[in-house]
Amino acid sequence: MSKLTTGSFSIEDLESVQITINNIVGAAKEAAEEKTKELGHMGPTPFPGLETYRDDWNLKLLDRYEPVVTPMCDQCCYCTYGPCDLSNNKRGACGIDMLGHNGREFFLRVITGTACHAAHGRHLLDHLIEVFGEELPLNLGQSDVLTPNITITTGQRPQTLGEIKPAMEHVEEQLTQLLATVHAGQESAEIDYDSKALFSGSLDHVGMEISDIVQIAALDFPKADPEAPLIEMGMGTIDKDKPFLCVIGHNVGGVTYMMDYMEEHELTDKVELGGLCCTAIDLTRYKEADRRPPYTKVVGSMSKELKIIRSGMPDVIVVDEQCVRGDIVPEAQKLKIPVIASNAKIMYGLPNRTDAGVEETIEELKSGAIPGAVILDYEKLGEISVRLAQEMHPIREAAGVREIPSDEQLKEWVDKCADCGACYLACPIELDIPEAMKFAKQGDFSYLEDLHDACIGCRRCEQVCKKEIPILSVIEKASQKIIAEEKGWMRAGRGQVSDAEIRAEGLNLVMGTTPGIIAIIGCPNYSDCAKAVYYIAEEFLKRNYIVVGTGCGSMDMGMYKDEDGKTLYERFPGGFQSGGLVNIGSCVSNAHITGAAQKVAGIFGGRTMEGNLAEIADYVLNRVGACGLAWGAFSQKASSIGTGCNIYGIPAVLGAHSSKYRRALIAKNYDESKWKVYDARNGEEMPIPPAPEFLLTTAETWQEAIPMMAKACLRPSDNSLGRSIKLTHWMELHDKYIGGLPEDWWKFIRTEADLPLAKRADLMKKLEAERGWEIDWKKKKIISGPKIKFDVSAQPTNLKRLCKGA
């Protein structure tokens, strides 16, 4: 019997019977694999499995960047043998040790994040194929390299929605294999869990890429547009006199139907539609490819979810998936705000009204008979949510629940405070709430106002208050003036970096004359304040780094203004260029950040992209200066995103809370045996400077993070001008934020031309006096001293197989 593929067939000799098969499980992937074999220029690893990258690449990375384990506790409670004490090198009843257990815990978080993005991608892909068909072309802007992550992983270059299916199937298949290794009695070696985590991270970027490219193509999002529209942002942008429909989550599928309903019924100026988290970003991208005037609003990041509910402003809340608080229904109930769950991943125990009538459902929700409902039919969702917001607005105003608490209630709550300090101890960022309460009792609410921006809205303080004071409501009430003026601007997510931008900037990045790419991504679980990401972005933008952002990071960068009242998005261009601030989009748009680095390797470096992860990653690690920042990372998705960057040789700095992820990847910069690569010209070993010296680490303060990130953009292949520019920035930033010169600056000097021009003479004196280097002062040249010699034609690689004659 011939092999079945997708399509339809009929069986002869059966009268009036036709059997139609729309899709055979695995057939799309099998067809893609057959097609892959026919293509030229294919790398060695299309459609990889758990073991594929292990020896060729992952273990090479992990040999240099050794895992640093930070357990949360000494016990393992994973199976019924336990709990087992794993302290002091003891093994559990199953035989696993602390390293293996900790590796499993980190790995579990990575695959959870990968699964989240993959499921997001599967949902959007199936939905958009159902609506638009498999033949819808992937119009993503003026680029030939449309799907770098998919291409590197599968060897395929899909051109339509339907052609993405093999990549989606591959991610799902490998996730099943990865999840199986977590079971008791499976993998026990920490190093192999780390290798599997890196593999999962690469799949995560495939899942994210699928999620974003299908919505860009089908929903008319901006397509690699550096001039995407500016969007109003902040709690102060919401008009309280209008019904407010508030959306929260990451999957914009259902929200587009709300927008369609509003546009069809001419309600865009009569109803406020705004959101939090990545759904907010993506609703501002819908139909914006032609840069029409936007009417939707971005309220802010996840940290504002509870704050916006406590404000009483939303008339209806619609949630979809990812990074949505678990207490939204009970919190909304207090203020008569109906909650609609629009995605099966979050249903909150609410009654399912997907098949119920529109009028019946609106009446149930409006009357308060039910606190909310599950509505998975997007056509109904669009109509019900908008109409319900219009009807709830006057009802809630009449009930007096538009804003809480009253001035009298605020004073009563403040006076109840016993100054016990429990809230201070419970606060994850140690906000001095007792001191603010003390001043508030005296009528000075400025200290409470100061807490508004720093507060991450977790409500842990309220859980421990013996007086049952709703502390978050106290802070928000005291900050009403600030909230009313909380208005920023953010450029709508532009999508991919175009091939043309890569060609224009690739040489500068590889040579080092553009100092590097700084990617500000991740969640708002900041250890200091949200303004830290603004300070970091501004510092690097003024120094002509390319700053790219996604998700909550992109939002928080745009919430603050300079002395002229301008946000960063108004001050700096939106192109992928030196000194450009590029809002790529939502969380799933992170794939385009790794995609940009991959494109540099493929387009500028001439590397084969198809099925060729190790070569692409090797090029990025040695040549492309880039560093990620997830300053408020909290979720499993943040872990998988960062790990996906790591496998491609892109380091990431995380905030102080992120040690709770349990693992960092830090090299020993003093161990010279770790800092050797091959010269691809002849296969000989060549020493390189310790750059980058980590793949994943944490910083305590944003002041510490800035010079750390500048240093992480140094690369072995920098030419002398690029090295001089990068060292100038690193050394200046170290002096500005830490004080003095870095201890190891001299390790990066190969020739006098590497030295920062303005301080060249002084630094040469230090090299002579402190390091014993020989200097020819007449010629102002370094005669001897550097262990690394500059060779402009050297071809550094970690892969022996790439060397000539290998």
UniProtKB/Swiss-Prot annotation:
UniProt keyword Iron, yes or no: yes
Domain of life: Archaea
Similarity comment: family membership: Belongs to the Ni-containing carbon monoxide dehydrogenase family.
Protein name: Acetyl-CoA decarbonylase/synthase complex subunit alpha 1
Keywords: 4Fe-4S, Iron, Iron-sulfur, Metal-binding, Methanogenesis, Nickel, Oxidoreductase, Repeat
Cofactors (names): [4Fe-4S] cluster; [Ni-4Fe-4S] cluster
PANTHER family: ACETYL-COA DECARBONYLASE_SYNTHASE COMPLEX SUBUNIT ALPHA, HYDROXYLAMINE REDUCTASE
Residues that coordinate or bind [4Fe-4S] cluster 4: C427, C455, C458, C461
Binding residues annotated for [4Fe-4S] cluster 2, in chain numbering: C76, C79, C84, C94
Residues the entry annotates as binding [Ni-4Fe-4S] cluster: H250, C278, C323, C523, C552, C587
Source species taxonomy: Archaea, Methanobacteriati, Methanobacteriota, Stenosarchaea group, Methanomicrobia
Reactions accelerated catalytically: CO + 2 oxidized [2Fe-2S]-[ferredoxin] + H2O = 2 reduced [2Fe-2S]-[ferredoxin] + CO2 + 2 H(+)
Quaternary assembly: Heterotetramer of two alpha and two epsilon subunits. The ACDS complex is made up of alpha, epsilon, beta, gamma and delta subunits with a probable stoichiometry of (alpha(2)epsilon(2))(4)-beta(8)-(gamma(1)delta(1))(8).
Residues holding [4Fe-4S] cluster 1: C73, C77
Biological function: Part of the ACDS complex that catalyzes the reversible cleavage of acetyl-CoA, allowing growth on acetate as sole source of carbon and energy. The alpha-epsilon subcomponent functions as a carbon monoxide dehydrogenase.
Domain commentary: Cluster B is an all-cysteinyl-liganded 4Fe-4S cluster; cluster C is a mixed Ni-Fe-S cluster which is the active site of CO oxidation. Cluster D is also an all-cysteinyl-liganded 4Fe-4S cluster that bridges the two subunits of the CODH dimer. Contains two additional 4Fe-4S clusters, dubbed E and F, that probably transport electrons from ferredoxin to the B cluster.
Pathway, per record: One-carbon metabolism; methanogenesis from acetate
InterPro entries: 4Fe4S_Fe-S-bd, 4Fe4S_Fe_S_CS, CdhA, HCP/CODH, Prismane-like_a/b-sand, Prismane-like_sf
Organism: Methanosarcina mazei (strain ATCC BAA-159 / DSM 3647 / Goe1 / Go1 / JCM 11833 / OCM 88) (Methanosarcina frisia)
